[in-house]
């Protein structure tokens, strides 16, 4: 007799069991299938747990998860916290839920009620690669074809800002474009108070560096 097909279903509506506790997952079996169902909060919790366990695939594969900690006391606290958060029930145009984010606020190493929020992918992509990983300033790449420095900004898509003889001039173009990006996000998501606070901090960093003619090393 052949074994049952195993299926995982994610993103189901959160609910409590008869004892009043939030349900993380439940199993449904049919004659041919073994279905592991995860509530939305349950799936997010499993992702957090996997990212925070030392020596697990996430920490080995992605350096950004090295040393990341989970300070939620347990799943019940996390699931209850989710219900009260702005954006938890919001969806993208493609139907996907907004993402749980720990990086937009100050502490990028801890999943906690103080550091996490739910944000749209549009905001998340604006801050991809906003940390120095090489000798060039943020937003700057050397274009071997022209022998110049290319300024490039990321959002929902990459956008080239031009070619410059100086890496500093290319970085200045990136700074100015990033300011406009953040200002547009502030105007678009003006009801998300936590995100507004975090975006204003990013904007302050950029505007301070521009005023002081300084390089922005991390955003």
Residue ranges and their predicted role:
Residues 78, 140, 151, 164-178:
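An aromatic-rich alpha-helical recognition segment common to small helix-rich domains
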Residues 2-50, 59-72, 76-79:
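Short helix-coil boundary/hinge micro-motifs
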Residues 43-59, 140-159:
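Short aromatic-glycine-(Arg/Gly/Cys) micro-motifs in beta-strand/loop hairpins
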Residues 182-219:
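Extended, polar beta-sheet/loop recognition surfaces of beta-rich domains
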Residues 61-148, 152:
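Short, cationic Gly/His-enriched loop motifs
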Residues 66-70, 157-168:
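A short, exposed loop/beta-hairpin motif centered on an aromatic-Gly-Thr core
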Residues 48, 173-176, 180, 187-188:
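Class I S-adenosyl-L-methionine
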Residues 149, 153-158, 166, 183-192:
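Extended, well-structured beta-strand/loop surface patches
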């Amino acid at each position: 007799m052949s074994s049952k097909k195993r299926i995982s279903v994610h993103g189901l509506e959160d609910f409590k069991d008869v004892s009043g506790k939030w349900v993380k997952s439940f199993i449904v079996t049919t004659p041919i299938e073994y279905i592991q169902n995860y509530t939305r909060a349950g799936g997010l919790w499993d992702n957090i747990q996997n990212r925070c366990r030392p020596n697990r695939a996430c920490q080995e594969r992605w350096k950004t998860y090295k040393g990341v900690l989970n300070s939620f006391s347990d799943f019940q606290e996390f699931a209850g916290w989710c219900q009260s958060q702005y954006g938890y029930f919001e969806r993208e145009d493609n139907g996907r839920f907004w993402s749980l984010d720990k990086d937009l606020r100050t502490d990028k190493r801890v999943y906690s009620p103080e550091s996490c929020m739910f944000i749209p992918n549009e905001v998340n992509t604006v801050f991809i690669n906003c940390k120095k990983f090489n000798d060039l300033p943020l937003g700057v790449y050397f274009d071997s074809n022209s022998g110049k420095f290319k300024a490039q900004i990321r959002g929902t898509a990459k956008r080239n800002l031009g070619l410059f003889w100086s890496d500093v001039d290319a970085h200045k173009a990136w700074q100015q474009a990033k300011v406009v990006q953040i200002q547009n996000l502030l105007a678009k998501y003006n009801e998300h108070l936590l995100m507004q606070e975090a975006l204003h901090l990013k904007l302050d960093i950029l505007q301070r560096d521009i005023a002081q003619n300084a390089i922005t090393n991390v955003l």
